[in-house]
């Protein structure tokens, strides 16, 4: 029997039991498609995560300060963090207090509930990339907070694209206009561009947002202490060294109580997310592999039935 005869015989066997052949192929098709889709989705998500980390910058670190005992930050002050950066300017390039909570804003008769409010310093804006260091958003109108705005606790703000559109009809019209936060009027000095990807939203960004000087935010929140600081190092390569410097200062400040603070780098956060994604991908691939195995068993079953029928 030559190859042509074997091929015709195989086609005849397939067409003899069309439903059986269809179900067999369906099992394999679903199994293979599942593996392809899962791997494609995993690679896509991985790419989006890497893109967002690159946008935020691997030279960024977050330091949480909870303090000792009753949870207060004791006598730790933002000026201590500024002094730390100044003393280690070869490794650290800046630090910003970071106060975040949801606030209610008003403009005339309009009310905006659950707007994300960020209290920061001028360091939160990277003048080289002309974007925020916590979300990579660029300005479309105006400017960001300045050193004098923060130092003098000026009632000025930078808002997101959603807020600019809904409250004022656009970014250009928003400049110089006023928004009320807890009865205090804040003048809009800048408008950020619109977020485009779900990854940016998942990273904590939102178009419904407003930036104000951090001490103003503390006053609105009714808090005394800053519990989160955002540092930047000279490069991604010096991030680990910068973290060691920050942790060393806090270790001494809190007299060896390592539960009083926590510092994490963007690289560490990315590695954690990648590890979690690896576990999820492993589970999904295992499920897809089971589908392939079931399909393979189905094929073996059909082959056995076909051979049995031919030998009778």
Describe the residue ranges of each PLM region:
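Mechanotransmission and gating elements of multispan inner-membrane complexes involved in transport
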Residues: 74-77, 86-91, 170-172, 180-187, ...
């Amino acid at each position: 029997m030559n190859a042509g005869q074997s091929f015709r015989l195989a086609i005849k066997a397939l067409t003899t039991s069309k439903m059986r052949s269809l179900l067999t192929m369906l099992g394999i098709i679903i199994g293979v498609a599942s593996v392809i889709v899962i791997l494609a989705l995993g690679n896509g998500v991985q790419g989006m995560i890497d893109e967002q980390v690159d946008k935020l910058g691997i030279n960024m670190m977050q330091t949480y300060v909870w303090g000792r005992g009753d949870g207060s930050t004791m006598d730790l002050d933002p000026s201590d963090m500024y002094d730390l950066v100044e003393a280690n300017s070869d490794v650290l390039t800046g630090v910003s207090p970071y106060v975040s909570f949801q606030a209610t804003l008003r403009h005339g008769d309009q009310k905006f509930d659950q707007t994300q409010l960020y209290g920061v310093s001028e360091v939160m804006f990277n003048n080289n990339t002309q974007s925020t260091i916590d979300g990579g958003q660029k300005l479309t109108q105006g400017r960001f907070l300045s050193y004098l705005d923060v130092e003098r606790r000026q009632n000025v703000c930078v808002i997101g694209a959603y807020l600019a559109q809904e409250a004022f009809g656009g970014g250009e019209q928003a400049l110089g206009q006023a928004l009320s936060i807890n009865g205090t009027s804040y003048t809009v000095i800048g408008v950020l561009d619109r977020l485009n990807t779900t990854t940016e939203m998942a990273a904590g960004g939102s178009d419904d947002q407003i930036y104000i000087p951090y001490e103003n935010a503390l006053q609105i929140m009714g808090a005394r202490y800053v519990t989160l600081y955002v540092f930047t190092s000279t490069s991604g390569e010096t991030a680990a060294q910068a973290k060691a410097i920050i942790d060393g200062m806090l270790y001494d400040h809190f007299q060896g109580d390592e539960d009083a603070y926590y510092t994490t780098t963007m690289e560490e956060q990315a590695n954690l997310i990648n590890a979690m994604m690896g576990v999820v991908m492993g589970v999904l691939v295992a499920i897809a592999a089971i589908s392939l195995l079931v399909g393979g068993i189905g094929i073996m079953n059909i082959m056995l039935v076909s051979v049995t029928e031919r030998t009778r």
